[in-house]
Amino acid sequence: MTGNEKNFNHSKTKKVLVLGLAKSGFSAAKLLHELGALVTVNDGKPFDEKPEAQELLSLGVKVIAGSHPIELLDEEFSLMVKNPGIPYSHPFVQKAQELGIPVITEVELAYEVAECPIIGITGTNGKTTTTTMTGLLLNAGDLPGTARLAGNIGYPASSVAQEATADDKIVMELSSFQLMGITDFRPHVAVVTNIYEAHIDYHKTRKEYVKAKWHLQQNMTEKDYLILNWNQEELRELSKKTKATVLPFATEQKLPKGACSLDGSIYYNQEKIMDITELGVPGSHNVENALAAISVAKLYGISNEAIKNALHHFHGVPHRTQYVGEFQGRKFYNDSKATNILATKMALSGFQLDQLVLIAGGLDRGNSFDELIPALKGIKALITFGETQNRLEDAGKKAGIPVIKTAENAEAAVPIALELSEEGDSILLSPANASWDQYPNFEIRGERFMEAVNKLTIQK
């Protein structure tokens, strides 16, 4: 193991409760056990739904599944590692706080054992693409070691931190849920792609959501770098409240320093790197993502040529305006990661709307779709599904969309979209909603959509 064990204070002879046995909980429990902690894992789902439980039991880790017995938690525990999705209103979390037990998320644990620099990336939208681009650019240079992706992107941070060497860099996608549970976490480089209203059902207010995002920089010093979207006034104001060295990036404006785009080209410190048309992914939002990633790459001395070549050959990540395939002259795109209105608006900006059939819908969080209406104007057809299908249909009517249909789910919308389209059109799944009304997560939603598209080619 390559982790920096001497930094970790909750290991030998210490009792630790891991709450939630998802990917991050499983990895955290294994790491803590290896560090010598007395680990107890608790998950509300029964054993037969948690195959990881058997592996932990074989290691000697205590696992309690199927319920949350409140008497399990007492003052003998020195730490709780909480799954990011579990709210702070959970009885276990509240009891831990009452007992004075620190409550962290797995990314804090990863920081404690990591021997290499961490690049932390957060924001409402663009986190995954920016994280992927950043890792790609860092690995395109001649740097020692490897840039390793971790965090909310799907690779448990504690596992990656264990495996990383001192020459590596960990590029970590961080959600607001994860950032609420940090104490000493300090990235050497941090990126905030943007901040818009989101996850109010979890954070209760926009102020609390922004506060969680801003935790990213709370331990940074002038020796660290904070890369911010200068198009957002809110981030420009927040930049005055950090000790880190601030590096801006912006679209459609000239910056004396930093990454920017202007008149169809991308620049860094006023030196042209590439034309926007040379990017391998479409859309103005992906220009922003590229600028953020370039900002990190230039800090590490990556050449303009390496950046240009890597971004030209990067065609996106799964479920983010992902090209699925073509059938009967129609191109299909999977943007299942678009779990909010802004993400769908950004996706729409990359398409010719009069040749686009949009598939949207999902979990009803009570959001108004009025702000989506301007972006819907000009679309050829709209297919809605899920809990929000009726309200999205109303928004489509207000936008003047000539053809609006409903479907049972995302995959059922595929043959309907085929009927409503013609050769040369694009069909885009960009739900503008979370997936949990019909699917376990946005990845499964996207996979079901892609399976339905692939069936078309088999049946032809």
From Swiss-Prot:
Key words, A-Z: ATP-binding, Cell cycle, Cell division, Cell shape, Cell wall biogenesis/degradation, Cytoplasm, Ligase, Nucleotide-binding, Peptidoglycan synthesis
One MF annotation (Gene Ontology) recorded for this entry: ATP binding
A family per Pfam: MurD-like_N
InterPro entries: Mur-like_cat_sf (IPR036565), Mur_ligase_C (IPR004101), Mur_ligase_C_dom_sf (IPR036615), Mur_ligase_cen (IPR013221), MurD (IPR005762)
Physiological role: Cell wall formation. Catalyzes the addition of glutamate to the nucleotide precursor UDP-N-acetylmuramoyl-L-alanine (UMA).
Protein name stated in the entry: UDP-N-acetylmuramoylalanine--D-glutamate ligase
Organism superkingdom: Bacteria
Record has Hydrolase as a keyword: no
Protein family according to the UniProt entry: Belongs to the MurCDEF family.
Annotated EC: 6.3.2.9
Organism (species): Enterococcus hirae
Residues holding ATP: G123, T124, N125, G126, K127, T128, T129
Gene3D superfamilies assigned to the protein according to its UniProt record, in alphabetical order: Mur ligase, C-terminal domain, Mur-like, catalytic domain, NAD(P)-binding Rossmann-like Domain
Biological process terms in GO annotation: cell division; cell wall organization; peptidoglycan biosynthetic process; regulation of cell shape
Substrates-to-products reaction catalysed: UDP-N-acetyl-alpha-D-muramoyl-L-alanine + D-glutamate + ATP = UDP-N-acetyl-alpha-D-muramoyl-L-alanyl-D-glutamate + ADP + phosphate + H(+)
Transmembrane segments: none
One term under GO cellular component: cytoplasm
Pathway(s) per entry: Cell wall biogenesis; peptidoglycan biosynthesis
Gene responsible for this protein: murD
Subcellular location: Cytoplasm
Classification via HAMAP family: MurD (MF_00639)
The keyword Transport appears for this protein: no
